[in-house]
């Protein structure tokens, strides 16, 4: 996902690592011998530890919530300190401190690489709950997140109903065929880069081209057609390239020079490579693909009936990765299962990325609920 508008960054009051001190068995059958979760805390739990808000990050986020959602921590922001305590936890599979493909496998002494096991959303929230136990946080005032973070928020309410008071899930539902197909293509872009080397690449020589292409395609899914048309239309690249020039005399007759939208996508891909790991991208997109709250239950309704929290689902009007009608349908299914559920729609031309691109509009939408 893209970054939100700039705001002064708020530093965590505490940042550290957690390990359960034992092997962690995964839903799909794998085992992590000694997993670690990186977490960050903003503010302090009160004496009753009932003022804690857990914010689950999206695909490329980290435990440092204020770094990627800064406007929500600014003066008057939804997550501004005071009587609140906000905790962010880097999910398993990521590359920002928690155990992921780039971590050392204690059984081999080498990075997990392609041997990193499949991690489910249920695995993610189960280990997060163990961290909360360690911190003596037994009930969460609110769990909120967007995209894969919203999946975590809903799964936390299903798996640990007694410890979640409220949920806000933004732009999240089980992926349908189009989303699964797009994630597959992004993974193939990485895997077909010769530098990927079957997942055994050196951190100094990662599959840059493949990851950059995957990110560029992902950015297309995070934005809306109307935003792209408004921003780029058919303008030539702002760097001075001429897409109407033949270029055949320079061996560019087939590739040509770029339109502005192409330059933007290339830039987004190149920038992303500097801050994210390709194998982590593979791992997290698979985690996203496989989220199915009904797994292990007789039906989705049976899973949803476990939820005790009040739930707010937020769809985004121009989101075509998680279309608003899918979010509304999920809300109806939750209500049918007896869940106290509200549904809101964030009207924006920014597509799936609106939760980051329009934090003020999001705050106005959520403020009455909070």
Task: Give a label for each model feature.
Residues 1-52:
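Catalytic-loop region of hydrolases
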Residues 40-106:
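N-terminal cap/lid subdomain of alpha/beta-hydrolase-fold enzymes
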Residues 139-179:
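Conserved hydrolase catalytic core segment
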Residues 169-271:
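Alpha/beta-hydrolase-fold enzymes
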Residues 296-300, 323-333:
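Short alpha-helix in the alpha/beta-hydrolase fold that links the catalytic acid
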Residues 307, 313-315:
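Short beta-strand/loop motif that positions the catalytic acidic residue
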Residues 331, 335-370:
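Catalytic active-site module of serine/aspartate enzymes centered on a nucleophile-bearing elbow/loop
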């Amino acid at each position: 996902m893209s970054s939100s508008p700039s705001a002064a960054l708020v530093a965590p009051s505490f940042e550290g690592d957690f390990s359960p001190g034992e092997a962690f068995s995964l839903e799909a059958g794998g085992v992590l011998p000694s997993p670690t979760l990186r977490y960050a805390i903003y503010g302090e739990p009160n004496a009753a530890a009932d003022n804690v808000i857990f914010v689950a990050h999206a695909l490329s986020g980290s435990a440092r919530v204020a770094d990627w959602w800064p406007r929500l921590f600014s003066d008057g922001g939804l997550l501004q300190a005071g009587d609140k305590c906000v905790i962010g936890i880097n999910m398993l599979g990521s590359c920002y401190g928690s155990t992921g493909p780039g971590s050392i496998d204690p059984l081999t002494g080498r990075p997990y690489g392609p041997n990193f096991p499949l991690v489910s959303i249920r695995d993610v929230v189960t280990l997060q709950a163990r961290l909360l136990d360690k911190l003596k946080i037994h009930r969460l005032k609110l769990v909120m997140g967007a995209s894969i973070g919203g999946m975590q928020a809903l799964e936390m309410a299903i798996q640990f109903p007694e410890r979640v008071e409220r949920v806000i899930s933004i732009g999240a539902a089980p992926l349908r065929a189009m989303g699964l197909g797009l994630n597959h293509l992004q993974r193939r872009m990485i895997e077909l880069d010769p530098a990927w080397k079957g997942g055994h690449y050196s951190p100094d020589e990662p599959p840059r081209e493949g990851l950059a292409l995957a990110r560029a395609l992902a950015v297309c899914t995070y934005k809306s057609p109307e935003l792209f048309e408004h921003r780029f239309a058919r303008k030539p690249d702002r760097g001075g390239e001429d897409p109407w020039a033949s270029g055949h005399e320079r061996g560019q007759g087939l590739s040509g020079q770029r339109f502005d939208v192409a330059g933007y996508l290339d830039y987004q891909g190149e920038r992303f490579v500097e801050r994210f790991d390709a194998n982590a991208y593979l791992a997290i997109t698979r985690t996203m693909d496989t989220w199915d709250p009904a797994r292990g239950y007789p039906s989705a309704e049976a899973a949803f009936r476990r939820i005790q929290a009040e739930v707010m689902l937020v769809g985004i009007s121009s989101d075509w990765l998680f279309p608003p009608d899918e979010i509304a349908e999920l809300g109806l299914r939750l209500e049918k299962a007896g869940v106290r559920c509200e549904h809101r729609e964030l009207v924006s031309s920014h597509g799936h990325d609106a939760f980051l691109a329009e934090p003020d509009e999001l705050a106005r939408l959520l403020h009455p609920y909070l």
